[in-house]
């Protein structure tokens, strides 16, 4: 049985082959498997952790292709659902010169939105050690109820719960709906990863310390705020710190946050009980975030999300050399 289970969307990213152009100007697109929770599952598997993915794909060529990608990377798909009622989600991605992205999603609806609460396999989740989910599937029913049901099962069975509220305003009817939807998963989590932009959006303040104060809750043991190439800042009960990033040549930042989160979970995994009880010291947390920064940086050096996720050897090499 997998030690880590991730839940949510998986899709096909069509990434512009040329940077610095709009979607309309792009001469061609390269197919790349992605979807934040699936990226985390593959990212952890490449680092050597046993993982499984739950959610729903279209019973179509793209859905079966995505299943094969997961399996080729060692991710268990035994509880993956398929439907003929909707297609597998697609996203078209244009890249700025610095590797940052703009998205156009095709989900009207997509299969991941139709994942239903009765399809959540309770024993499968209950036997794991870590459960990770994101916010994209919280935007529509029945996917939202299924995702939250899975998170509830995880919490009730003592799993360590990780959450990634992913800000994609185009997927919500309004900014307020996005804020409310993203916060629906907040209280379930022991670990949360957000960007500076997401922290400001959810809290309403650009003062990071104030934002963290406002967003903190009793179950939370670690909040990691990513800051792009600058690195990340972490907050834990009685501890906090900034950890600088690694300078690499960024080609495509798609999946960088997911690689960061996979790296963070990998680093913390042997000490989850100590983290839960507040027993990790500041230096141990810094080392975990440094590993996560290295994984995130490496993911920007290749196009696509899953194709760019690094191996343990690649992360260790960057940690050792700094370049």
Give, region by region, the residue ranges found by the protein language model.
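Glycine-rich phosphate/adenosyl-contacting loop at the front of the ribokinase-like
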Residues: 1-76, 115
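Conserved phosphate-binding/catalytic region of the ribokinase-like
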Residues: 2-5, 152-153, 204-323
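Short beta-strand scaffold segments in enzyme catalytic cores
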Residues: 42, 90-94, 231-234
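Conserved N-terminal subdomain of the carbohydrate kinase-like
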Residues: 50-135, 317-323
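Glycine-rich phosphate/pyrophosphate-binding beta-alpha loops
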Residues: 89, 135-139, 296, 302-305
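Short gly/ser/thr-rich secondary-structure transition/capping motifs
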Residues: 109-118, 171-177, 205, 277
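Acidic, amphipathic alpha-helical patches
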Residues: 121, 179-182, 250
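Conserved beta-alpha-beta core of the PfkB/ribokinase-like small-molecule kinase fold
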Residues: 130, 136-214, 220-222, 230-231
């Amino acid at each position: 049985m997998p030690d880590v289970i991730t839940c949510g969307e998986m899709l096909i990213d069509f990434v512009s082959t040329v940077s610095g152009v709009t979607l309309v100007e792009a001469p061609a697109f390269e197919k790349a498997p992605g979807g934040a929770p699936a990226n985390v599952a593959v990212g952890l598997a490449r680092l050597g952790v046993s993982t499984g993915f739950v959610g729903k794909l279209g019973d179509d060529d793209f859905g079966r292709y995505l299943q094969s990608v997961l399996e080729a990377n060692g991710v268990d798909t035994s509880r993956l659902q398929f439907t003929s009622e909707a297609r597998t989600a697609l996203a078209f991605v244009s890249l700025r010169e610095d590797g940052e992205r703009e998205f156009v999603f095709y989900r009207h609806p997509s299969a991941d939105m139709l994942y239903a609460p009765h399809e959540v396999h309770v024993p499968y989740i209950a036997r794991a050690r870590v459960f990770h989910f994101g916010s994209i599937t919280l935007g529509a029913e029945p996917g939202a109820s299924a995702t939250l049901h899975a998170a509830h099962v995880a919490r009730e069975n003592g799993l360590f719960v990780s959450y990634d509220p992913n800000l994609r305003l185009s997927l919500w009817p309004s900014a307020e709906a996005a804020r409310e939807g993203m916060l629906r998963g907040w209280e379930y989590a022991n670990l949360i990863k957000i960007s500076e932009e997401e922290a400001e959006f959810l809290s309403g303040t650009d003062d990071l310390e104030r934002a963290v104060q406002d967003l903190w809750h009793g179950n939370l043991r670690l909040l990691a705020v990513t800051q792009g190439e600058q690195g990340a800042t972490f907050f834990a009960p009685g501890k906090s710190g900034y950890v600088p990033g690694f300078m690499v040549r960024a080609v495509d930042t798609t999946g960088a946050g997911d690689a960061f989160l996979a790296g963070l979970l990998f680093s913390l995994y042997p000490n989850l009980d100590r983290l839960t009880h507040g027993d990790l010291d500041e230096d141990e947390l810094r080392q975990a975030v440094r590993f996560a920064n290295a994984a995130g940086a490496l993911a920007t050096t290749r196009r696509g999300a899953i194709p760019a996720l690094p191996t343990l050897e690649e992360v260790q090499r960057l940690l050792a050399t700094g370049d």
